[in-house]
A protein has these predicted regions:
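Solvent-exposed, acidic/flexible segments
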Residues: 36-38, 67-69, 132, 146-150, ...
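Periplasmic N-terminal accessory/gating domains of Gram-negative outer-membrane beta-barrel systems
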Residues: 83-238, 244, 251-263, 273-283, ...
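Short, solvent-exposed loop/turn and secondary-structure capping segments
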Residues: 114, 126-128, 168-169, 183-184, ...
Length: 619
């Protein structure tokens, strides 16, 4: 079991409060035509999609700061006695950004107004962070390759010049691979065991549910001290006063593909990445009108695929070997490989020797009863490549698999609700869940038939919760509190679990042979079976509070953060037993150079001469 607890408490002071989670800030200064500071001006920062309003008052130096704003487009309204009303439209706040909007107020009546409709400049002048922001339009319109898995928001990281590689090789800002951190609405989505983007992506919503994200590569604050090189900041979408919805399907189908030049026919390749989103105000006719107050956002994304198996060549024992006949067991030069009787092992003249089986035939009286019960399942698989007995091709690389597939069905659901309480408070709730499976397709597994198939089924399930509360204590003081919880269960198991194996196959002295078909490995043939349940639970939770306070031309930020992450292993991999068989158990003692040594791992199996064995208790 591994766990990680991080606690940080910070106090920052500077000319402005630097945004650092998925939230942003609008800051600036107001002056009169002579350049003097305008003190006590009343400001309203309005989120245009919901009409949610944040209030601020300019300080004694004319400075203002509106902190903890969701990524969106805002309108700034300013009123002060003796000055015309000022309105700045189209102020775009990105994830983790600080936007400076300065204004010069004109003398006049408050009933008069000056309105600026052009977009405010978004150049970062208040900090030295290197940040790449991928905004909503690019998130919606950028094509992502759907290649064997659901679209991942981490695919978008490639647009940042500071990011290199992918998966466990991803590095950001020159940091080491897998040393980055990724956050969803201010809290980490990473796991305690891996910096793999595939794992972290399971704890993030669908690409369609993200409004934007940012990549910070330097200058990030103490709350991200666990990251090396960079921080990926994801912001989830919220509902607005307008109803919106979408439906989509990213399709790949072999019917639209060209045949490979050397192939006789097109390979089966079918994928669908499809889903929908719905968002808007919560309205219950005649009961409740949630415009300007209550909003929802819902999304579902599903991924289904079916890919034809590539031809795979395996090595399987021949039918006569099951009877003990190794007279056709030859090397690549078609020379007989002698099998030696382990029961004749003795010391002679200072050397350990064995006698060969006459005619390379093992008598049935030496067969292991357990081996015979296991071998029953292997007899159905015989060489199928057409090589003649007595040739190398008959005993190795002799089995062609042309069918079977692995499929990876995945479902992802995201639900978010926002409630504006009066003019000073906002509460947000987010729930995201993902179910990922990796298992054989309808035509069976791509390998030996069950129970001999040595692959595993994967079942990964995640849930991510986010709760946030924003409270404008006063025009110059804003508090943001958030809570997060992540659950991530990775489970892998064979296709043979829980099938009453005790009455069919049972290796003596294992913990529980009823749980799983045993795992059998050979040095010259494809192994049989796979391990039972095993995996990790990786729960985590965290608290965070940020208090932003503006006084004079200074902005102060106080806060604390607590993170608790665990990685708790579980499983019973070899609870049904594992046995490895080597040619050395039926070869010339001390000679490990196969095939000159003689011997056969399958002969060792028939006679019960395990080279290595193990079982495992439940953990």
């Amino acid at each position: 079991m591994a766990n990680l607890r991080v606690f940080s408490c910070l106090v920052l002071s500077s000319l402005s409060v630097f945004a650092q989670s998925e939230r942003g800030n609008i800051t600036g200064a107001l002056t009169d035509p002579s350049g003097a500071a305008v003190v006590g001006a009343q400001m309203s920062i309005v989120q245009t999609s919901t009409n949610a309003t944040t209030h601020a008052t300019t300080s004694s130096s004319g400075e203002y700061n509106a902190a903890n704003l969701l990524p969106d487009t805002y309108r700034i309204e300013v009123s002060a006695p003796g000055f015309k009303r000022f309105v700045q439209q189209n102020v775009i706040v990105s994830a983790g950004s600080t936007v400076r909007v300065n204004a010069t107020l004109q003398l006049g009546q408050v009933s008069e107004s000056i309105e600026v409709t052009t977009s405010a400049a978004t150049i970062q002048t208040d900090n030295a962070k290197v940040t790449t922001v991928v905004q909503n339009k690019l998130v919606d319109q950028l094509p992502l390759v759907v290649g064997g898995a659901m679209r991942s928001p981490f695919n978008l990281v490639a647009v940042a010049a500071e990011a290199r590689g992918d998966g466990q090789r991803l590095s950001v800002g020159g940091g080491q691979a897998a040393q980055w951190d990724a956050t969803l609405d201010g809290h980490s989505v990473g796991t305690n065991r891996s910096g793999d983007t595939a794992e972290a992506a399971l704890n993030t919503p669908s690409v369609e549910s993200l409004t934007e994200f940012a990549v910070d590569t330097n200058g990030f604050k103490a709350e991200y001290g666990q990251a090396g090189g960079g921080v990926l900041t994801f912001a989830s979408k919220s509902g607005t006063n307008q109803f919106h919805g979408s439906a989509y399907d990213f399709l790949r189908n072999d019917a639209m593909d060209a045949r490979n030049f050397f192939a006789a026919k097109r390979s089966v390749y079918r994928q669908n990445d499809y889903g929908f989103t719905a968002a808007g105000p919560v309205i219950i006719p005649r009961l409740y009108n949630g415009r300007d107050k209550t909003f929802f956002f819902v999304s579902w994304e599903g991924f289904r695929n079916r890919v034809g198996a590539n031809d795979t060549i395996l090595s399987v024992p021949t039918p006569e070997m099951y009877t003990g006949d190794f007279s056709k067991w030859v090397d690549q030069s078609n020379k007989l490989i002698t099998v030696y009787n382990p029961n004749t092992t003795r010391v002679s003249g200072g050397l350990t020797i064995r006698d060969p089986y006459p005619g390379n035939l093992i008598p049935a009286s030496q067969f292991s009863a357990t081996a015979q019960s296991i071998a029953t399942y292997g007899k159905a698989v015989a060489p199928n490549r057409g090589f003649a007995p007595g040739t190398s091709g008959y005993v190795r690389n002799n089995y062609l698999v042309t069918g079977g597939t692995q499929i990876t069905p995945t479902d992802k659901i995201s639900v978010k609700g926002d409630q504006i309480i009066g003019s000073r408070q906002r509460v947000s709730l987010l729930w995201n869940t993902t179910a990922f499976r990796n298992k054989p397709g309808p035509a069976g597994a791509p390998g030996l038939p069950e129970p001999l198939w040595n692959g595993q089924i994967q079942a990964w399930d995640t849930e991510a919760y986010r709760v946030a509360h924003d409270f404008t204590v006063s025009p110059n003081m804003v508090n943001h509190f958030s809570f997060a919880k992540n659950t991530f269960t990775k489970n892998s198991f064979s296709a043979n679990v829980d099938k009453d194996w005790k009455s069919k196959v049972c290796i003596k002295n294992v913990v529980d042979c009823n749980q799983n078909f045993p795992t059998i490995n050979f040095t010259e043939f494809t192994g049989w079976g796979s391990s039972s349940y095993n995996g990790t639970n990786q729960p985590g939770w965290g608290l965070r509070d940020d208090l932003s306070y503006t006084r004079g031309n200074h902005s102060l930020k106080f806060g604390f953060q607590y993170q608790d992450q665990h990685a708790d292993g579980f499983g019973q991999q070899d609870i049904g037993g594992r046995a490895d068989f080597s040619f050395q158990s039926t070869s010339i003692p001390g000679n490990t150079s196969f095939p000159n040594s003689g011997g056969s791992s399958f002969a060792s199996f028939l006679t019960g001469q395990a080279f290595l064995g193990r079982t495992e208790t439940i953990r």
